[in-house]
Amino acid sequence: MKILFVTKQDYHGVPNGGSAGSKRNFQLLSELADVDLYHIKTRKNLFAYLSLIFMYFPGITLQHIQEINQKCKDEKYSAIFLDASLFGGIAKYIKRKFNCKVVVFFHNCESDYFKMLSKKNIIKSLYYLYALFSERQCTKYADIIITLNRRDQKRIAEEYLRKSEYLIPVTFEDKFIKQKMNRQKQLCNEPVILFVGSFFLPNYEGVKWFIENALPLISAKLQIVGKGFEKVKYELEALNDKLEVIGTVQSIEPYYTDAACVVMPIFEGSGMKVKMAEALMYGKTVFGTKEAFEGYEIDCQKAGGLCNTGEEFVTAMNQFLKNPVYYNSYNRQIFMEKYSNSNVKTIFEEILREVST
């Protein structure tokens, strides 16, 4: 079976949450079928502006449509896997012109995300309308829709009157080697709390809230690691002298290894938080909000703690830091049982069987 996989993610750049989920999809499909990758690169030219007239989401152009059209003519794909719900225009074009199945993966409910942004940036209101239109097209023309969790499944059904056929949660390729844990460094240094996430609004607002409302009363240093956070390094570090902003890194592993625990003060969003699965993979204790744990089948107290206020973060984390355990065997077990790539491979196999009929 031959499949065309369409994505906006660059798998060769600095990894982030979005690219990790997309790369997982591509890798597992490639193990099961003959998959061609089509990378939608953002272009600023006449095609980009003309595409807005046709209600393609910004960044998707008529030129992209033409290139996908040519690939479909040449290769005669059995299915097109659209790795974002913002590809509604592509879904519509494919279904009207070619006799092949269309699968759409909703990494979250994008219209909800842009609606949230539009409250703080009027220009994002336009993006919200394009996202709404694109997701409506996806739900109309896709043969199969995949969501991360039941919350997104329910939200999409409410908004577009279409329920997703499959649930595939966030998972990771297991890269953890327990022997690499630097126990000597952990015993000698002041405990480090780790926040991991790329620089976008919910992450920025969440970690800034934590710095202002919890960190002053917690007996540890905070490190912030994630693509783009170096942009606000001096702004954030000025808020507390127990804070170090690292920003973009090529490898996240050393930071997880040396951290006593992970904090996830996320209050807005949809989908599942990719960095939660990553923290579980490394066997790290996690203190997070309800939003951070959303979609994960886990005992929050065994994982670390469910904290939604500054006081809850301070109490739970200071108690943990009295005798920090750098390796949480429960979290590691949950990862192996539910959030390792091998646990969802059978679902992709089932999807491929369905699109081949």
Q: In which residue ranges do the predicted regions lie?
A:
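Short hydrophobic beta-strand element within catalytic cores of glycosyltransferases
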Residues: 275-281, 285-289
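Conserved catalytic-core segment of nucleotide-activated headgroup transferases in glycan assembly
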Residues: 21, 171-235, 245, 249-250, ...
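N-terminal subdomain of nucleotide-sugar transferases
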Residues: 1-43, 75, 213
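Membrane-proximal helix-turn-helix segments that form the acceptor-binding/catalytic region
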Residues: 66, 110, 124-145
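Acidic donor-binding loop of glycosyltransferase active sites
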Residues: 257-271, 282-284
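A charged, aromatic-enriched C-terminal amphipathic alpha-helix characteristic of glycosyltransferases
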Residues: 324-354
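Active-site proximal beta-strand in glycosyltransferases
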Residues: 3, 96-116
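Donor nucleotide-sugar binding/catalytic pocket of nucleotide-sugar-dependent glycosyltransferases
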Residues: 136, 140-179
